[in-house]
């Protein structure tokens, strides 16, 4: 059977103060009253049954997840006791699916992306399922066909086409986020896709890869499934590492018996990682300011202005250029746009000097 796991962990620190530890970005109802999590679920409707959709999130967010997706059975919401990077969410989820269905094929999708059109996404995901079902040793990643030399995404280098499928290729190598000139060369070559961070595989195949690469992790997630009452004891033993570093990159380099393949996603895709990507969804005024909420500007241009307090509050600026201003009821952020990637550092200082309730 086919399963989908929505990965909805993380605190979304780069979107502070909109996103907080107690209310991370995937739960914020910023998009016409819907959250990124709800939108991720709705993209799956008609593709798999609700009984086969799971969400892996932080334990502290499990209640909110259940409220936002009431269609899911309670046992399909997996609450991590602590965040330990993407591999462990993936590995635990795969172990849960394998325990329920040894023949289960599972897609790991993320809850922090905007994807249109949905029917094209479903078509590509269905192809990835078909590939994983037909080729038991396949690790199938989804690659977004790039439309610009984006420097904020990782890339994958595709090689020869896989016979019997359309828009399916072998992956030669994974690439880190490039500088502008290198990203342009990737785009010009036509051989590189953006790494969407979504994969499809047989649950037992992923666990078999971990047996080869990280046997302690494989053994621990199996033990968690066998003895769920011990999760608080066992989960902290898992190594903090991403699934790309732990599995996908070694497999693509031939260090395991798996084949790494990719299915093309020809979609409008935005990974909502920080304010620069979020601003792409906002309305821009005649001065190039991306605005959300009630704002007034004077001699200000190229800014990102967010008023999350409400209609009884106004954010007003004078003489700002390329600035970021985010106002919430309990915290306000003012920064240069070029420093937006440093918000993590700032949040650590806020936690230390102002208190955890503001972080």
Please report, for each region that a protein language model flagged, where it lies by residue.
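Residue-level signal for inorganic ion chemistry
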Residues: 37, 93, 112, 156, ...
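Left-handed beta-helix
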Residues: 203-359
